């Protein structure tokens, strides 16, 4: 007897949808988001494995684990690129964005579904080329910044650097195509009441991120193309002997590189706003309009401060003064966001779900990273601390603890919506405790190393630094163990099939309200636009849905 197929199991034209068609040629936002999630988790685990190799080497003075200083720098380079382009960005922007943006704007899918599919399949090809550069010739040991002259002949004479540059081109193209899709979706698809200042904060964070990507990715592409031409076509864009200037590449790279920091952290801001609002039981975050303009201000200022990475290259006093002041000004909108989150928690019966643990941990750790950033924004201070472990500690507090805690917070909050099962709550809280202890033990001692003068990118060091390096390596082992524990938690949730009884979401949460009667939801939640009602005071929005569960 023929099996009756549900509509979700049918293709777009009524035929049975095969496994290959669903996952290789998918134009469904949820399937593509799931693919990004799988890819990002794999990239994150591989990048974390490389970081453990780095810390095993630095646990004791001398070449105790990695016998070659060149290979040490190859591992550092691959770790950075893997975590940025193939772990945090695929999960925070692409996976969560693909899953949630259509739900939050009231749309059926992304505005360009086929472009969405193209955006994903460029990413595995870029990942393959990155792995190929890691194993080709001697690998790329120039750091993720690939500064010339280290990235050109004769210092990188093999093909590995060329392969890496092509990988970055593909990764950048993937991000650019996805950003155009997100920006177009967020501009054109929201129902009327969800546009402008009334947009969901996560939607706004993805919109600002998409604009930053559209501005900065072409500049990176131009810079690395110039390196490719210097290496292969005898140009001298960055060679002083031919009239070039290596500092030009630093300007091009950091015009991309600093917005990239906000590209990584802004989606985490959106996740925190959603989770804190949910766990506080409130219909809107405190100071909603201030939060909107703070996020826009952070994105705008982020494009104007790139040269604070270059205080030691010989900038004149006026230029250093401008970039130092502009960098400090970013602390103002960032402070607005942090205190608005705290005010949202105030006066509420805060539900300490696992996601709430990650959100409160994020607030503490991101604040610490921001305070060390204020010190580094001073041009005179940065001259002493530039390229020391103080800088490593600063950006890992913002990224390894900010963006990554945003990833875990989002997974704990939205996994029931994505796959219909829940993590074990007690075990998830234990995972947070282990991760929180591990990352702090790893990176807080590195402030002391930097203040003592320990430089970055060296595999060996004086014995005086051995104690804090040992403590940092111990914390790294704890962090890696907590990641393995998370793999177990994910497996346990999928095997036990611990279903969702009810979402706990308020009526104003479109990500939950659209699928409130079934988890996970169908491939397309809305067959028609939802009806949206705003209260007279414009402080929050309540959503009323017609029954529209069909395709």
UniProtKB/Swiss-Prot annotation:
Highest taxon listed in the record's lineage: Eukaryota
Annotated GO MF terms: cytochrome-c oxidase activity; heme binding; metal ion binding
Localization of this protein: Mitochondrion inner membrane
Pfam families: COX1
Details of cofactor binding: Binds 2 heme A groups non-covalently per subunit.
EC number: 7.1.1.9
Pathway given in the UniProt record: Energy metabolism; oxidative phosphorylation
Top-level class of the enzyme under EC nomenclature: translocase
TM ranges: 34-54, 81-101, 126-146, 163-183, 209-229, 252-272, 285-305, 326-346, 356-376, 391-411, 432-452, 475-495
PROSITE patterns xrefs: COX1, COX1_CUB
Cross-link (1'-histidyl-3'-tyrosine (His-Tyr)): 258-262
Name of the protein described by the UniProt record: Cytochrome c oxidase subunit 1
Natural source organism: Mytilus edulis (Blue mussel)
């Amino acid at each position: 007897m023929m099996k009756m197929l549900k509509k979700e199991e049918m293709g777009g034209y009524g035929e049975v949808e095969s496994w290959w068609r669903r996952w290789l040629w998918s134009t469904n936002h949820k399937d593509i988001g799931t693919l990004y999630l799988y890819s990002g988790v794999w990239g994150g685990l591989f990048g974390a494995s490389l970081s453990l190799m780095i810390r095993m080497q630095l646990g004791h003075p001398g070449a105790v684990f990695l016998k070659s200083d060149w290979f040490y720098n190859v591992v550092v380079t691959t770790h950075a690129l893997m975590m940025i382009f193939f772990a945090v960005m695929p999960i925070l922007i692409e996976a969560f964005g693909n899953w949630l943006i259509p739900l939050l704007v009231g749309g059926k899918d992304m505005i360009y579904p086929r472009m969405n599919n193209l955006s994903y399949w460029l990413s595995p090809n870029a990942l393959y080329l990155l792995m190929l550069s890691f194993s080709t010739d001697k690998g790329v040991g120039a750091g993720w910044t690939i500064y010339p002259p280290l990235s050109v002949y004769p210092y990188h004479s093999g093909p590995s650097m060329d392969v890496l540059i092509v990988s970055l081109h593909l990764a950048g193209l993937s991000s650019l195509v996805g950003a155009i899709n997100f920006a177009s979706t967020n501009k054109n698809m929201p129902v009327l009441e969800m546009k402008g200042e009334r947009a969901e904060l996560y939607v706004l964070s993805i919109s600002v991120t998409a604009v930053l990507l559209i501005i900065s990715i072409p500049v990176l592409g131009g810079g690395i193309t110039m390196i490719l031409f210097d290496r292969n076509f005898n140009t001298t864009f960055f060679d002083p002997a031919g009239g070039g200037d290596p500092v030009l590449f630093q300007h091009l790279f950091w015009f991309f590189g600093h917005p990239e920091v906000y590209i990584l952290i802004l989606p985490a801001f959106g996740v925190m706003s959603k989770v804190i609002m949910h766990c506080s039981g409130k219909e809107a975050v405190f100071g909603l309009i201030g939060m909107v303009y703070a996020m826009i201000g952070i994105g705008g200022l982020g494009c104007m401060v790139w040269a604070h990475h270059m205080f030691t290259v010989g900038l004149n006093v006026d230029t250093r003064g401008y970039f130092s002041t502009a960098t400090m000004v970013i602390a103002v909108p960032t402070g607005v966001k942090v205190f608005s989150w705290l005010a949202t928690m105030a006066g509420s019966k805060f539900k300490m779900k696992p996601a709430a643990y990650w959100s409160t941990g994020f607030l503490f750790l991101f604040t610490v990273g921001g305070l060390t950033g204020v010190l580094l924004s001073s041009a005179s201070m940065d001259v002493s601390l530039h390229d020391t472990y103080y800088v490593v500690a600063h950006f890992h507090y913002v990224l390894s603890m900010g963006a990554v805690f945003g990833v875990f917070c989002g997974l704990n909050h939205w996994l029931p919506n994505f796959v219909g099962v829940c993590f074990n709550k007690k075990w998830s809280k234990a995972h947070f405790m282990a991760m929180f202890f591990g990352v702090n033990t790893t990176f807080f001692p590195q402030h002391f190393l930097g203040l003592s003068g320990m430089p970055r990118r060296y595999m060996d060091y004086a014995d005086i630094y051995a104690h804090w390096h040992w403590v940092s390596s111990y914390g790294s082992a704890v962090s890696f163990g907590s990641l393995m524990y998370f793999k177990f938690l994910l497996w346990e949730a999928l095997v036990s099939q611990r279903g969702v009884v009810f979402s706990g979401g308020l009526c104003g949460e479109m990500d939950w309200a659209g699928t409130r009667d079934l988890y996970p939801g169908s491939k397309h939640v809305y067959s028609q636009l939802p009806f949206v009602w705003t209260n007279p005071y414009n402080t929050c929005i309540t959503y009323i849905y017609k029954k529209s569960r069909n395709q």
